[in-house]
Amino acid sequence: MRLAEVVRNTSETQIRVKINLDGSGQQKLATGVPFLDHMLDQIARHGLIDLDIEAHGDTHIDDHHTVEDVGITLGQAIAKAVGDKKGIRRYGHSYVPLDEALSRVVIDFSGRPGLEFHVPFTRARIGTFDVDLSIEFFRGFVNHAGVTLHIDNLRGLNAHHQMETVFKAFGRALRMATELDERAAGQIPSTKGSL
């Protein structure tokens, strides 16, 4: 099993992330940001990754630091669990619909952080959740997981549906990229010999 635990403590947040990449989608989520918990649940269930995330942050100011730092810590945990990347598929992609919304996510465990985020949300908030925080979550994730990530919402009228398709597709792409390929067991998935 590929397990990892990362703790991040700053003056703004205290976060603990435990993951099992070879899990069944079990989750225990307590970030203090209910909509973020809902989206993290999508990653766990659709990625079949067991997630245990606890966060305490300065949400009395706003949710920005908590959301961003959960992304950072999750990225660190994924990188730790993947390790040297031997035998993984490296690339993953997924299209996910939800009613009128459709999103595509493509990920590469290249070791080169990069984010292309193209989601034209139809409103600025989903309940109390500022949709701009989703890009902060993913930026924190890519910078600390060392991945290239392309996120495109291809269509959608309902911002909740747009966001949910993004997180579901992300979970599925993550699962595909981190799966072990028995035909490439013990090999680094790169012509360079390292990632």
Swiss-Prot record:
Documented EC number(s): 4.2.1.19
Superkingdom in the source lineage: Bacteria
GO cellular component, one term: cytoplasm
CDD domains named among the record's database cross-references: IGPD
Keywords: Amino-acid biosynthesis, Cytoplasm, Histidine biosynthesis, Lyase
Pfam family, one: IGPD
GO biological process, one term: L-histidine biosynthetic process
Protein name, per record: Imidazoleglycerol-phosphate dehydratase
Gene: hisB
